[in-house]
UniProtKB/Swiss-Prot annotation:
Transmembrane segments: 50-70, 85-105, 119-139, 142-162, 177-197, 202-222, 287-307, 326-346, 354-374, 476-496, 512-532, 543-563
Record gene name: slc2a12
Extracellular side: 71-84, 140-141, 198-201, 308-325, 375-475, 533-542
InterPro entries linked: MFS_dom, MFS_sugar_transport-like, MFS_Sugar_Transporter, MFS_trans_sf, Sugar/inositol_transpt, Sugar_transporter_CS
Keyword annotations: Cell membrane, Cytoplasm, Glycoprotein, Membrane, Sugar transport, Transmembrane, Transmembrane helix, Transport
Catalytic activity: D-glucose(out) = D-glucose(in)
Role description: Insulin-regulated facilitative glucose transporter.
Segments on the Cytoplasmic face: 1-49, 106-118, 163-176, 223-286, 347-353, 497-511, 564-610
Protein name: Solute carrier family 2, facilitated glucose transporter member 12
Gene3D superfamilies given in the database record: MFS general substrate transporter like domains (1.20.1250.20)
Similarity comment: family membership: Belongs to the major facilitator superfamily. Sugar transporter (TC 2.A.1.1) family. Glucose transporter subfamily.
Membrane topology recorded in Swiss-Prot or TrEMBL: Multi-pass membrane protein
Domain of life: Eukaryota
Organism the protein comes from: Danio rerio
């Protein structure tokens, strides 16, 4: 038989060879496992599960700092700005790598990137644990941040590209579920080691096991067929896809799936990066909607509630590292409980409705928490303890007065009177206008009245009666925070990703999500690294009330600007968003509907007559 004829002949003989015709060239492919036999289902599940360990690591690393920070600020005598740098270092690393991570993904592939980021996580964790210093901790957390940011993108792409089309939604949901499970694990281990000397080392080291497991197993799994096609490795792509689809009945033929991948890749090549910032098809408006959505998502306070959970709880009455960390562990439980129903409700209710309901719950819970923090007098409480504002060796009796100079070295003042009521000053915080005092009574931290500073940078401090946080306010604060977390988990947590994947056309979706992801990390970094400073300046209640106000703005934004995606195809959504008058039409939609009902157009009358 002539070579040209042989190159297009297809045969069902298992011992023969398959030849797939490409529009431009004829590619010779060796026969791989039959799509009708084999265990492709198990291979897909294994590949997705190992890749989604990245979600577990992301959730774990984001949540563990809440409890570990209580120990670290004592071990390393961290000041308020230094605590913010420890928290923000992970976010800074994530932001930096999100800017250029796409190049690594496209050049080296999803599988290699996942392996690389797992090893990077191991390196950052070992640096944080083995070298006990502030800068080693910051650099180690930056490396971990780079790891979780890039691996999160790589694992989602890998899972979507190796799974059959009918499974892709569930595979992405598996990643989201792994994130919240990682958060639960992070909170749980933080509590377990809260009372152990150097327990923060064990908490940080908990990331080593899943990272090493992922780095060890991932090389044994197949690469993404889409990446192989992008690298012009069609023979390998065909063989890999045959392995992944072997034995799965509800999938299209491998050749058809390869053809669909080529068409999608061709559509992506039609759009450049700069197209995102042009008015064609309202692309710039779509980008602004996505950016505003993720900004408001972070501005509702979610990063700070997550990272500073134990710190906030200790200020509202949960004294002691163990108590505050145990209370924050409930956040992980609630996150899991809120994410699971969201997965099942999104197709029935729609993401827009879930966003509105969840954000309203967040708004009410933060308003309640803000009122409680004012009643419990946490508005004069310092959330920071550093080397420059602690005088643990100074003992006073209630009613005593003494002169305390600014920048007093630790232990300068010795006990002036024999301790009678077991009351002693534990911290002094200079806010430029007032001294904010905390003191301990029978191992329970209580708040003191503020005293104005004199022009000579000294103050007459009159020790006042104890102000205990009542048990009822303490537990209402915890419930308010748990309700806030539940509202976030059923709405902003998973639904923002659903909306972002729907408002951009297929050809430019990857570029758009990358830009918004970088903006998301930058916003997260800004909010997390200013939380303690803001609470010192304006007070915790004011900060909490600002979160409630941002939640209200977010509800209005979702109602006005976020399109309804329930029961609509991506093509329908994109067509509507591409209309030049979409923004104006959205703002006036209710007025137009009313007008259309009252006065039908001539075309509608003609159609009705027909």
């Amino acid at each position: 038989m002539d070579a040209p004829e042989e190159s297009i002949r297809m045969t069902s003989d298992p011992q023969s060879k398959i030849y797939v015709q490409n529009p431009d060239t004829h590619i010779h492919l060796e026969q791989g496992p039959s799509a009708k036999s084999g265990n492709g289902r198990a291979l897909v599940l294994c590949s997705v599960s190992v890749a989604c360990l990245s979600g577990l690591l992301m959730g774990y690393e984001m949540s563990l700092i809440s409890g570990a920070l209580l120990q670290l600020r004592d071990v390393l005598t961290l000041s308020c700005p230094e605590q913010e740098q420890v928290v923000g270092s992970l976010l800074l690393g994530a932001f930096l790598l999100s800017l250029g991570g796409g190049t690594i993904l496209d050049h080296y592939g999803r599988r290699f990137t996942i392996i690389l980021t797992a090893l990077l996580c191991v390196l950052g964790t070992l640096l944080s644990v083995c070298v006990v210093s502030f800068w080693a901790l910051v650099v180690g957390r930056m490396l971990v941040g780079m790891s979780v940011a890039l691996s999160g993108t790589a694992s989602c792409l890998y899972a979507a590209e190796v799974a059959p089309a009918a499974w892709r939604g569930r595979c992405v949901c598996v990643y989201e579920l792994m994130v919240v499970l990682g958060m639960l694990l992070g909170f749980g281990l933080s509590w377990a080691f809260a009372g152990v000397p150097d327990g923060w080392r064990f908490t940080f080291g908990g990331a080593l096991l899943p990272a090493l497991l992922q780095a060890g197993v991932m090389p044994l799994l197949p690469d993404s067929p889409r990446f192989l096609l992008a690298q012009q490795r069609e023979k390998e792509a065909h063989a890999t896809l045959l392995r992944l689809r072997a034995g799965i009945k509800e999938v299209e033929p491998v050749e058809d799936e390869l053809r669909a991948i080529r068409l999608a890749m061709g559509a992506e090549r039609l759009h450049g990066f700069l197209d995102l910032f042009q008015s064609r098809d309202n692309m710039l408006q779509r980008l602004l909607v996505g950016a505003a959505l993720v900004f408001l998502q972070q501005a509702t306070g979610q990063p700070n509630i997550l990272a500073y959970a134990s710190t906030v709880l200790s200020s509202v009455g949960f004294h002691g590292n163990e108590a505050a960390t145990l209370a924050s562990t409930g956040f992980g439980v609630v996150k899991v409980g809120g994410t699971i129903p969201a997965i099942f409700l999104v197709d029935k209710v729609g993401p827009k409705a879930l966003l509105c309901v969840g954000v309203v719950v967040m708004m009410l819970s933060t308003a309640t928490l803000g009122a409680i923090t004012m009643q419990s007098r946490t508005h004069v409480s310092s959330l920071c303890r550093g080397p420059g504002n602690t005088a643990n060796f100074t003992l006073f009796e209630t009613g005593d007065e003494t002169d305390i100079q600014t920048n007093t070295p630790l232990g300068l003042y010795q006990p002036q009177n024999k301790l009678k009521t077991n009351t002693f000053l534990t911290s002094i915080n200079d806010t430029r206008e007032h001294w904010i005092l905390n003191h301990t009574y029978n191992h329970r931290t209580a708040l003191m009245e503020t005293a104005e500073l004199s022009k000579k940078d000294s103050a007459k401090i009159a020790l006042q009666s104890l102000h205990e946080v009542s048990p009822s306010l303490k537990w209402i604060s915890l419930v308010s925070l748990l309700v806030y977390v539940a509202g976030f988990s059923i709405s902003l947590g998973p639904m923002v990703h659903v909306v972002l994947s729907a408002i951009f056309p297929t050809g430019i979706r990857g570029k758009a999500v990358s830009v918004i992801s970088a903006f998301n990390w930058a916003t997260n970094l800004l909010i997390s690294m200013t939380f303690l400073t803001l609470t010192e300046r304006i007070g915790l209640p004011t900060v909490i009330f600002s979160y409630s106000a941002m939640s209200f703005l977010l509800v209005v934004f979702v109602i006005v600007f976020v399109p309804e995606t329930k029961g609509r195809s991506l093509e329908q959504i994109s067509k509507e968003l591409a209309m030049k008058n979409h923004l104006r039409g959205t703002l006036l939609c209710h007025r137009r509907k009313h007008k259309a009902t009252a006065q039908p157009s001539q075309e509608e009358k003609a159609l009705a007559t027909v």
